[in-house]
Amino acid sequence: MKRAIESLGQTADIKTDNFDTIEGSYDRIWTLSESLLPVQAQLEIKLGLKNLSVSAAEVLTDKKKFDDFCIAIGLGDMIPKSVIPTCEEDLFDGDLIVKPTVGSGTKLDGFSYTSYHSKEELLNNIPDNFFETNKKGFTDPKFNNVQSYYMVQEMLPTYSEVYGYYAYIDMDGNVHRQFCVKLDTKLIRYGNSKYYNHPYVIQSIDEDEVPDIVKESSEIFYESIADVLGVRNMFISGPDFYVYDGITKMIDCNPRIGTGNTLMDKAMGFTVIPDIISNKKIQYNKHFIWRQADLKPGTIKRVKDYSHLKEYISETSHELHEGKVIAEQTNASDSIFNMSIIVLGTKKPDMQKTYQAVKEELQNSIEYY
């Protein structure tokens, strides 16, 4: 983002803490984590900006308020059933997932974002003080100490087709849907009761591959973010649309630039973000694949030089070296072990072949104990 702004001859300041000390004249703020949106809203007031209100920040930060907003704009049929339980009787039957109302699906702690096949299995795994904690709520310093609660939500089928758009709202409130991605998910079981279902492949797709219901619903959603919430100058990643058995549901919206935008920017010669900032029309003519390498689990005895492959390896991937334990990867940004391959290009069949070739060469470079 900073590089894009400076390429246009403008200046940018990056702040990671001490936000209350920010002074000066600015025309817009971009927040790279939704947990900081409340801070941005306060800074907007302080600096005399009108891109994000306090109430809009709350809707885009809190999953329960997000669901309530979607219901209010006519998308209620797409919102999964959920509850913030304060007693056992509040829970409902079926496959369930536990989410903090303020948090990220990549921040796993053994309980948050874990799924269960039944109410009984959830009850067998909840902390002793779960219901009492949920009565008063809790805060997490990783998410700017915003008040949060545990939300128990209907778990959507693991065989769903999952789609999500990247979009942005410009300074005049015009919505620009950029491109859509398709996410392939993988179910990881923990014992007999717990499981995760996270994406292991994220790839951009052509507009004619997107279901009409996803196009129509995303348009309603983005226009409402701009018109009802009054949001301006914001990148949006999501929501994720789950399509299954003739049903479509939507979850989660991340008001940030997102990895997909970063990859598309790189694929198109680092022109996307500058063109967005300059309000230029963009023709997206490239694609990306971001996929786990799915390396064989084990402990590395030795590894051959693979530096020539690093142009295809994500920046968040872990280094391979003697003694490194390769664990089963749960998602494309797993903090325990991550080795993900990124392929940029135009023709998808060629991109898939490149992915497979890089994966095989990487795997063949490893010798295990």
Would you name each region that the model predicts?
Residues 3-11:
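A short, Lys/Arg-enriched amphipathic alpha-helix followed by its capping loop at the start of a domain
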Residues 16-91, 103-106, 337:
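Conserved N-proximal alpha/beta basic substrate-recognition cap immediately N-terminal to
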Residues 76-80, 113-159, 221-228, 368:
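Conserved ATP-binding module of the ATP-grasp superfamily
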Residues 95-115:
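Conserved anion/nucleotide-ligand pocket segment
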Residues 127-189, 209, 238-249:
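Phosphate-binding site of ATP-dependent enzymes
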Residues 159-224, 254-281:
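ATP-dependent carboxylate/phosphate-activation module, predominantly the ATP-grasp catalytic core
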Residues 222-260, 292-296:
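Conserved metal-phosphate-binding beta-hairpin within the catalytic cores
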Residues 277-369:
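Peripheral (often C-terminal) accessory segments that flank ATP-dependent C-N-forming ligase machineries
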